[in-house]
UniProtKB/Swiss-Prot annotation:
It comes from Saccharomyces cerevisiae (strain ATCC 204508 / S288c) (Baker's yeast). Seems to be involved in cell wall organization and biogenesis. Residues 23-42, 405-439, 494-517, 803-842, 1100-1149 are annotated as: Disordered. This is Protein ECM30. PANTHER family: PROTEIN HID1. Coiled coil: none annotated. One of its GO terms (biological process) is cell wall organization. Present with 1080 molecules/cell in log phase SD medium. Residues 1110-1125 have a biased composition (Polar residues). Pfam families: Hid1. The modification Phosphoserine is found at residues 635, 1065. It is found in: Cytoplasm. Disulfide bonds: none annotated.
Amino acid sequence: MGNTDSKSSSILLNHCIALVRPEDADASSPSRTSSPSPSLSVDADPLSLNLSIFKLDSGPDVEALFSDKPNVPLDTVFNDFYLDFISVDVQDFSINSSFKKILHIISSLNPPNFNNLIVFLSLYIILSANSLPASRTGLHSSRLINAIKTLSILIPIYFDRVKSSTQDHYDVFWATQHEIEGLPLQNIPLGERLLLAILKLAFQDNFTTAVTAHPSELWEIGILTNSNKYRSLLNMHHQWHLFANRLLLLRLLAALFSSDLYTSGGKQDINMFLVYWCTQMPKDKSIQFTSSLLNCTMRFILNNNKDFQSLKANFFSSDATASNWQTLYFQFVQSCLHVLNLSMSYKAQDNVITIFLTQLQREYDLKLILSSFIKIFKYPIDLAIEQESNIFNFTNNKHIDASRRRAVSTSSHDNSSSSHASLPSSSSAAYHTKPQTKPQLPEIHPLLIPMTILMTNLIDCNKCFQNYFADKFASRFIIFSIYYLKYYDYSSLSSSSSTTRSNSSTTSNGTSNDTSNERSIVELNENSVSQILLPLLNHLLLILTSKKLVLFKMLQTFNLNYYTNNLPNFYKLSNINGDINNLTFRDFTVIQLSNLILDNIKFNLQPNPIFYELIYNLLPINDEILTSSHKNDDSHDDLILLSAKKKSASPSAATSSHTSSSKLSYNAAMSLLYVLSKSSNKVYLTTYATPVFKTKDIPYMISPGFKMDLLALLLRSITIFFTLYFDDAENLLFAMVRHQSITHQINDSINSISKALDMNPNLNSHIMTLKQMGFNRKVQWKDFYQFEEITDLPQVNLYSSANQQHQNQQQGQNDNRGQNQNEDPGQENESPTPYLLFNPASLENETPGTVKHFSSTNHDKNYQVIAFIDFKSDSNLNLQHQLEYWPHRPQWPTPLTFTHKCKNPKYENFNEVWSGTVYLQILLRVIKQILSKVPEIPRIKSVQYFETLSKLSALRSDILTTIHPRLPLDVRRLTTFQPLSMHTNDKLLMWFHIATWANIFTQTSFKYEETFSHELRQFESLLDISIDECEGNTISKPTTDRLGYIRRSRGQSSVSLERTISAGSGVSTPTMALNRTKSNGSGNLMNYFFQNTAQNHFQHLRSSSSSSSITLEKTTSNSSSIRTRPNSHHVAPETNNNNSTNGNSNNSSNGGFSFFKWKWGGNNSNGGSDDTKASQRDPNVSTSIITDNLNSYMFEEEISPGVVNNIIENNIWVGTDIRLFKIANFRKESFSFLEMTSSFFKKFKFINSDNDNYNNNEFDDNTQLRYTSRGLYR
């Protein structure tokens, strides 16, 4: 990486210091026409001085600008000191954490000047929006773009300081006119004017819309347009700068809405920008803007493949140019979704955006939105089908391993069960065997999470869209959502393999391996799917299955062609006997859910209640549920059937239809019996489950009590099913009678537990009064991995004070030994026998397992840094935490609630007060009565099956008459089934808001270089501070003597940025070029789209190189301007200095450009080539030439990688103290060539370790860091 012009570097350094010491501002610009306010005393504290935003005697011009008179040049109004900040591109500031720290220092040491800089940038954007587009020059547009970029960087720092301050102070954006003297705001807050300016710039000619566009024209055709004809991008490829400017505006909006990031999840602060944006903007412009965002997103999803293929074939000169365009457009669409989701996250009745989306009811609009979501939602499923049908896959033995959520090797899968049988040893040969890789499941689409958030909001607010979604896609959405729950739940994978990781994550000396850190990155980023996408799908599943229309649709049968061609082979059912045309969506779903439950039981994983709740909603239904919903006054479901006609009322047709769709199939019935058999095992019911994450906040969700409640919920669902719809439950009743031993096993298990509890009355009282059931000792995490197979009930040791004291002593010894060995507490001396008593105090000292993502930082080296969300330890996002768990669950039936349990008598036997006892006794009585009438059921052959069902159907009235008095009162009153439903509450809305921000942060965080340069250390010494210690802490002000030394040390070496005013235009332009050079190794931009397959259709990869600025050069050739492509042909040569051979040379080969790689100390003899070229340029170059080159990228038909990176990789919020969720940083040292060669053998060993999968594929130094749908950079 070459060095920029040293003069401009010195100017920017002086400006940064001048913001801290305002009285020193004149030294940075001797020709300045203004000075600090003369009303301030000379003896005032230098840090209290306030640099004026406007020039002296500019009052009339300022009044004219605020009076909507756009003919006043902005350069004649604003102080040149502030104009310097937007005279060069500051994009690189945003990706350098050290510069973020300097900005934090400026904000802390001198808040007035930092606020003035923000006010200046805001005013420049506001006044530029009011100016006529035709009057703008290239310099003006370039400064406007830089102002938008710079304000996007400063806003999070401003919010960080304001939210963390304990003192009350006014907000510059929402202050009154009296608090901001000199600004004729006319009682309109600055923040509102800024939002209005952004809205105006969003539809301004030659900035965000085409010159020929109408002011009320949308960005894209679709919603709110009479014409349905798609306007292809083929006619707009040469105007890519319009999309770049739109992206910048959307990023600025997201930054303005981000004040919530700096408040804790439980604190409710008013987000003024979001409130004003949703309620105070002009209604017509807000609707126009919202429609444009929707249309651009939907058209991109539906039409991008065809468009980009045509662009690549007919217009672009190279594949790289096409990739740059695709990357830019993808980021633009992604930002559209971010702004839409943030706008809808503000729940208020006067939200204009929500009101508009609520009123969408035209079928074309609804179809456009739904079709786009379906394409994104089915993307990985279509890729899996395509991978299976690929002819080249038949030539090898590799296949998709979908048995344990992800593709793993056969050997590792076989060893996964053995890891539960005994404590794994780090020396075990099984863990040093090199695995044989298999093709992994396709990645989800990067837009799936924000699109799912958008769909959730639309279903919640728009009744027409909810009805359309339920009628057209709900049944298929349910089966595909279960596909995601089955194969993309990485949390269950991490819990089953955490023992192995705990033994391999540290070395013998306790230091962390690079491989384990990289693996931690993989796991934590996979949690963005497990902790955001899957809860969203769970929420939608519960909402949809509570609707009678959706339940009616689930009784429809599969089409043979659809089942064959639209489901992956590994997701199809293997035990289906008979015609696929008789398989209903309900049967398929129940079987898949049963398999998931059995899988969790097999490995004793933490139960997932969504599986049981979905079975509860889907099981007790028949084909009359849609019509019966209109007969009940208590039903709030008013969705109507849109697509299919109701079935014929003829008896023959009704009978045939009833047989094929309404009855539960025998295969589905047997799946439920397997669940009852395994979940009622005595060992399973009396042991803690393996927790998803190591945390002390989830005793109930892994406790035996939770397992018993889920079993009771399943028994209640079966009881309601045959009580309300006896004929449809015949197959299930037949299976339960034929396998009557299962119900007796449930009864025996409950009785055994009850007898064990009866032996200790005190223990029994605890069980009856507490919701939790647990151990009476500290939980030993390794005990969770000693459960392999369900056998007999072990001996139950009862609680006593004597053995409790002995256990406490033994526990302390085990803890000390475990800490000395750097392992989790709980060794082989600790008995794994469970105790059926929950002692809350036993978990107080349990420390949740955490992964150390920070390594010791060496200030002499450079690091690649990635900021990501630590989902595991974040209690606001991770729904596995106790407090955040229950708001996301539906209200269970009254007999299973905590309130009902508290009403049970204290000293009753457990088998009498257990929530499932009443349903179990009813089932036992029904089975006994059926066997007394039809005793041959356990011995019949398949040919007698239908005859036996006829006999069973004849017993309907007798059975219902017998059990009716014994039914619980709430079941007895039911005339139609009432499914579980979700109810919106404040905690649920808060989680959705946090999840929205978590997705935005994940998708806008990029890799950046953390460089500790000599100039940065000099800056620290001059200000007498330590930047490394200034992360969120109070920064002490430097003394006046120290600031005086700064002024004297700068002396005559300060260089000014002189300006000349072009006659007639009034536009000030620099007299010298501000050049920035770029190495040949930077700007490598990877494609995220390829065109031939479904996978290549959506594959998105972000550039691993840091952003690069546009080279601004002034050249003359025969008095005409020469347009140069940025960072392409006219790039200043790289400076060859003595430092190019040492360890710092990796800075130049790196793709990123750092603010602190500039030469701060003034002119450098080694950098003379750049200065010489600058001094040899003609000082009399005309303004038109300069302005054209300053904004030349706006007129180039082909987009360069440097420009794309410059616009995209901004890391707006990285480096600030985000408090809404927990942020972790992963640092990886950047090795120079010399360091890499000196550690060749170490590197060789690193590559050939047993974790070579991670080294070679995930974080190899020689590979680019790629962005995947899980937020992983590799």
